[in-house]
Amino acid sequence: NSYADETFTNLESVPKKSEVRFIGRCLGTFLLAEKDNNLFILDQHAAHERLLFDKIMNSQGASQPLLIPYKIHTESKSQDNQLEKLKTKLTQIGFETIKKEDGYWEITSIPERWTGTEYDLRTLIFVKQVEPEQIIRSIAAMTACKAAVKDGYYLDDETSAKLVEQAFTLEDPHCPHGRPIYTVFSREQLFELVKRT
């Protein structure tokens, strides 16, 4: 179970005062939990993606050096300026960016969880977005999405419970693309579904 071990090594247990109780897994994609007389159905990919995204955006992700740096040739002064504006933020999320000379840049390290290509990064950097912050957010979202546990991947009980606990600590219960991490059914809604009073 090395993928789960590697992917979830940094998941920390939430203090026991948490009222969340992990119930089980469903359809290889969902985690079931109970809290405050409500049933929560969590999307394991969306929850893990959000946790990774927040870590990346808070500069907690590890970086790894590239044996062969990404080489980026800017095609205009505006692209060069764009990269200059993004340089500090890129470094904060794990992309070590060095300007070799006007029009020539190198990325010498990437976030540990980055699975994109040089082309992916270049496309994200030079996409026609006004705010540099949105570009950084897009890069972090792509990194988190590709690194998050996939649908159909079986998580053991301990890992599932940790993921559920941490999902309930998130300030924003949505993946970086806006999908909700969970759906909630109250006790009353469940009773109504089975025609019980």
Q: Could you tell me what each predicted segment is?
A:
Residues N1-E19:
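Acidic, low-complexity intrinsically disordered tails
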Residues S18-T197:
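Long, charged low-complexity intrinsically disordered regions
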